[in-house]
UniProtKB/Swiss-Prot annotation:
Top-tier EC class: ligase
Name the UniProt record assigns to this protein: Valine--tRNA ligase
EC number, as in UniProt: 6.1.1.9
GO biological process, one term: valyl-tRNA aminoacylation
Pfam families attached to this UniProt entry: Anticodon_1, tRNA-synt_1, Val_tRNA-synt_C
Listed CDD domains: Anticodon_Ia_Val (cd07962), ValRS_core (cd00817)
NCBIfam families on file: PRK05729.1, valS
Catalytic activity: tRNA(Val) + L-valine + ATP = L-valyl-tRNA(Val) + AMP + diphosphate
Assembly description: Monomer.
Residues reported in the UniProt entry to bind ATP: K557
PANTHER family noted in UniProt: VALINE--TRNA LIGASE, CHLOROPLASTIC_MITOCHONDRIAL 2, VALYL-TRNA SYNTHETASES
PROSITE patterns found in the cross-reference section: AA_TRNA_LIGASE_I
InterPro entries: aa-tRNA-synth_I_CS, aa-tRNA-synth_Ia, Anticodon_Ia_Val, M/V/L/I-tRNA-synth_anticd-bd, Rossmann-like_a/b/a_fold, tRNA-bd_arm, tRNAsynth_Ia_anticodon-bd, Val-tRNA_synth_C_sf
Length: 907
């Protein structure tokens, strides 16, 4: 007999250990001979990371699909692993060194520091893998990989060297996102855009050949900027070619204030006539948009910052080129050189104002890019880096999606993919870090580069080139973390070696991802997979939405609304969290996670637990001879028909990645059909003396429960596995753990029996609803009068009269030609069911109560309607508050309709 209460905490831990001891998730487990392979690559979480709600949704979706395919007999591999997370890991270890007052990274040296990181990785890194286990993910943990392990490192070197020798990797001087605190280039994903209350400075730039006069607009052009500190690197001014104000100035020159550099005035659509003054100063070396304008118009690039974002003027040849070194300029250089960029900003603005160049300063809220780890503003910085020719690699990746070789679900993300890929820029793959894949490039004494897989090969290449042995210096930079992640679908399977796993599982079957890394990860896996394997890495990309808080707000530390999945697991169980995420995971719709919903689905799990316990208490046991098609009782044939429909709904939902539809179908069947109706309808049989009927319902119930455990298993794996194990004693030994049992088939249908029982359920539900609406006392037995009932209704009443009376609290059932006066009427198929109300309630008192209720609701609706019609409320209130009020008015109108219907029944 099951315990009275389901103890999720202890059971989930025990079941997880049983799965691992059984090796239930190893590739090939549960598969049939010559089975079709099915492979999913777990997006490798950062080794520094901990489980968040995005992980929980992502891995729950994957696990549902993986468990489903495993139960269908496929040769399944869900490949787990972790990412070395370059910047994040290096920062964690550096912080640890500082806290322990140990030598710094620089004092320790590269080799010892990297050794220290490896120690940290083995001691405390990878906590997230154990957290994922708590969620119940069924990865093949015996194959866990790490992006820095030997095999993957070999793959990284192979790819880098191959691309270099194909001319697809090269070194170039371009703008990058530069973190002046961490002193490295970072990816766009590591940049956080923050809204700041900044300023827009309007400056007068003198026109060449004109005597500057602040009061004479013909002697200058006004430019607007949010970054005065970068003006030292200006090399041009852009105006829109359609802007009549400046058309006559196109092709002329202005003079850079304070410096004296000649600036070309160029026509470029980048300049917006409606923003600022319409004229934009162009600093190609310190702004990404300006870089493109400069490239289109052949403007010089002058870098005026150091790696630490300090002003760099002294010994800056590019800065002095073409300008007269006056005493004023010498003084400027002396005052600003080596100053922090923001200190320099204040000094430059003061000088511009002092010399009459400042027009005005406007308050100007705008976004500023910050490093998400360093917390300092990012600087577009001109530096030498390694780049991948992403545009060339993107061509086949674009074509593959056009041809349908890879599809996005929802398909709206395909447009986003094309937009990114068709406008792709060179991919900066070098990082100024110590932790990561060190770039396999060595430099000769004259700066010539030798790119090889090993130092020995590089020395041999250098010997061939120079004709003598020379010393080589290795490039100190490491590769962008996304470089190794892009190889994940084939490097984890043993590439560049031709392994059986590679032959079996590549291409993989599915990629599940958040929309924020379609470009950073999915697109790059597409490019690398096609280039090195000749096939797309996966035919399907399922893009899930964001998990937001219950009000629909994005979760963030600053808002204090982050929901910790581990706390939810502790409080409600992993299965309850998983089912909640699944049932809310509608395609293209963000998940608004309300803990009360998780509590509700914990109750759902309890409902099934109690149903199984109820079955045990009533002698339910397996009968090896039971076959659905042999069932005789209409109740059993009905539940078997409804079960088959549920099998179809759940299977179709998972196959089409509509997990919410599958979960909803399971919820309806288990809670309503099975527990509320089938088991309730069985009670008279359990309590009766008809042994044949009792034996059949006992065997059928055991069979149906088994099928339910199987269907629910991908969503709630722990509890279903426990129930599967504990119900083994009901007369049948289990052939294996539930995780490895065959998925159910929809093999039964009896629509006549289903129609009859559903009629009974509809009749009972309708009568119960009227009793509730009309406030009929629960103890009162009501007479039921049936009008216009034909042969079908007569037959059904004869078959199910006793059940109808018991469940609907009906005293007598009679047939009549017309409805009794003052009766509540319900239409059921061909007949009208009538409850004479005068015999059951005080009509006048009930009418007064309902009138009072409806009056209060109408007042509330009027107030809310006025509130929602007020533009100021809509404009000033938080969006989630507006949404709450809109939902409230919908609820009130629904209640209003119900009460109005009840009043109509009293007429």
């Amino acid at each position: 007999m099951l315990e009275k209460n389901y103890d999720a905490a202890s059971i989930e831990q025990r079941i997880a250990k049983k799965w691992e001891a059984r090796g239930a998730f190893k590739a090939g487990m549960g598969s049939k001979s010559a089975a079709q392979s099915f492979c999913v690559m777990l997006p490798p979480p950062n080794v520094t990371g901990s489980l968040h709600m995005g992980h929980a949704l992502n891995t729950t979706i994957q696990d549902i699909v993986v468990r489903f395919q495993r139960m269908r007999g496929k040769n399944v591999l869900w490949q787990p692993g972790m990412d070395h997370a370059g910047i994040a890991t290096q920062m964690v270890v550096e912080r640890q060194l500082a806290e322990r007052q140990e030598p710094t990274r620089q004092e320790m040296g590269r080799e010892k520091f990297v050794e220290r990181i490896w120690e940290w990785r083995y001691e405390t890194g990878g906590v997230i893998a154990n957290q994922l286990r708590r969620l119940g993910v069924s990865c093949d943990w015996s194959r866990e990989r790490f992006t820095m392990d030997d095999g993957l490192s070999e793959a990284v070197r192979e790819v880098f060297v191959t691309l270099y020798k194909q001319g697809l990797i090269y070194r170039d001087k371009r703008l990058v996102n530069w973190d002046p605190k961490l002193l490295t280039a970072i990816s766009d994903l590591e940049v956080e855009q923050k809204e700041v209350k900044g300023h827009l400075w309007h400056f007068r730039y003198p026109l060449e050949g004109k005597l500057f006069d602040p009061s004479d607009a013909t002697t200058f052009i006004t430019v607007a900027t949010t970054r005065p500190e970068t003006m030292l690197g200006d090399t041009g001014i852009a105006v829109n070619p359609e802007d009549d104000r400046y058309r006559n100035l196109i092709g002329q020159n202005a003079i850079l204030p304070l410096v004296g550099r000649r600036l070309s005035i160029v026509a470029d659509a980048y300049a917006n006539p409606d923003e600022g003054s319409g004229a934009v100063k162009i600093t190609p070396a310190h702004d990404f948009n300006d870089f493109e304008v400069g490239r289109r118009n052949n403007l010089r690039l002058i870098n005026i910052f150091t790696e630490k974002a300090e002003v760099f003027l002294h010994e800056n040849e590019a800065f002095f080129e073409g300008v007269v070194l006056s005493d004023a300029l010498k003084m400027l250089v002396k005052d600003l050189d080596q100053k922090d960029r923001f200190i320099a900003r204040d000094q430059i603005v003061s000088l511009m104002e002092e010399k009459g160049y400042l027009v005005t300063v406007d308050d100007h809220p705008h976004t500023v890019p910050y490093g998400d780890r360093s917390g300092v503003p990012i600087e577009p910085f001109l530096t030498d880096q390694w780049y991948v020719n992403a545009a060339e690699l993107a061509k086949p990746a674009i074509e593959a999606v056009h041809q349908g070789k890879t599809q996005f679900i929802p398909d709206s993300w395909q447009k986003t993919y094309f937009n990114w890929m068709q406008n792709i820029q060179p991919w900066c793959v070098s990082r100024q870090l110590w932790w990561g894949h060190q770039i396999p490039a060595w430099y000769g004494p004259d700066g010539r580069v030798f790119v090889e897989k090993s130092e020995e090969e590089a020395l041999n290449s250098a010997l061939s080139h120079y004709g003598e042995v020379v010393n080589l210096t290795r490039d100190p930079d490491v590769l962008d973390t996304w470089f190794s992640s892009a190889l994940w679908p084939f490097s984890t399977l043993g590439w560049p070696n031709k392994t059986p796993e590679l032959a079996t599982f590549y291409p993989t079957s599915l990629s599940v991802t958040g929309f924020d890394i379609i470009f950073f990860w999915v697109a790059r896996m597409m490019m690398m997979g096609l280039h090195f394997m000749g096939e797309v890495p996966f035919p399907t990309v399922y893009v899930h939405a964001l998990v937001r808080d219950q009000k629909g707000a994005k979760m963030s530390k600053s808002k204090g609304n982050i929901i910790d999945p581990l706390e939810l697991i502790d409080q409600y169980s992993a299965d309850s969290l998983r089912f909640t995420l699944a049932i809310m995971a509608a395609q293209g719709r963000d998940v608004k996670l309300d803990p009360s919903r998780i509590a509700g689905y914990r109750n759902f799990a309890t409902k099934l637990w109690n149903a199984t316990r109820f079955a045990q208490m009533n002698g339910v046991k397996h009968d090896p001879d039971f076959k659905p098609e042999k069932a005789k009782l209409a109740l059993n044939r009905w539940i078997l028909t409804e079960l088959s429909k549920t099998v179809v709904a759940v299977t179709t939902g998972i196959e089409n990645y509509k997990f919410n539809e599958s979960a909803s179908a399971l919820y309806r069947f288990i809670w309503n059909t099975l527990c509320d109706w089938y088991l309730e309808l069985l009670k008279p049989i359990f309590q009766g003396s008809n042994e044949d009927a009792k034996n059949e319902v006992q065997a059928c119930t055991a069979w149906v429960l088994d099928e339910v455990y199987k269907l629910l298993h991908p969503f709630m794996p722990h509890m279903t596995e426990e129930l599967w194990s504990l119900t083994e004693t009901l007369g049948m030994k289990r052939e294996d753990m539930l995780a490895l049992i065959q998925w159910p088939e929809a093999s039964f249908s009896d629509e006549e029996a289903a129609s009859d029982i559903n009629w009974l359920i509809d009749a009972v539900s309708a009568i119960r609803s009227v009793r509730f609406e009309m406030n009929i006392p629960a103890a009162a037995l009501a007479p039921l009068v049936i009008v216009e009932g034909g042969e079908l209704t007569l037959k059904r009443v004869e078959l199910y009269e006793s059940l109808l009376k018991k469940l609907a609290r009906v005293e007598t059932i009679s047939f009549s030609d017309k409805a009794p006066a003052l009766s509540a009427q319900m239409i059921l198929g061909e007949a009208i069911f009538c409850l004479p109300l005068g015999q059951l309630i005080d009509l006048e008192a009930e009418r007064a109560r309902l009138m009072k209720d409806v009056s209060k609701i109408e007042q509330d609706i009027e107030k809310l309607s006025a509130k929602l019609s007020n533009p100021k409320f809509i404009e000033n209130a938080k969006p989630e508050i507006v949404e709450v009020e809109r939902n409230r008015i919908v609820e009130l109108r629904t209640a209003q309709k119900k009460i109005s219907l009840a009043l109509e029944r009293l007429v």
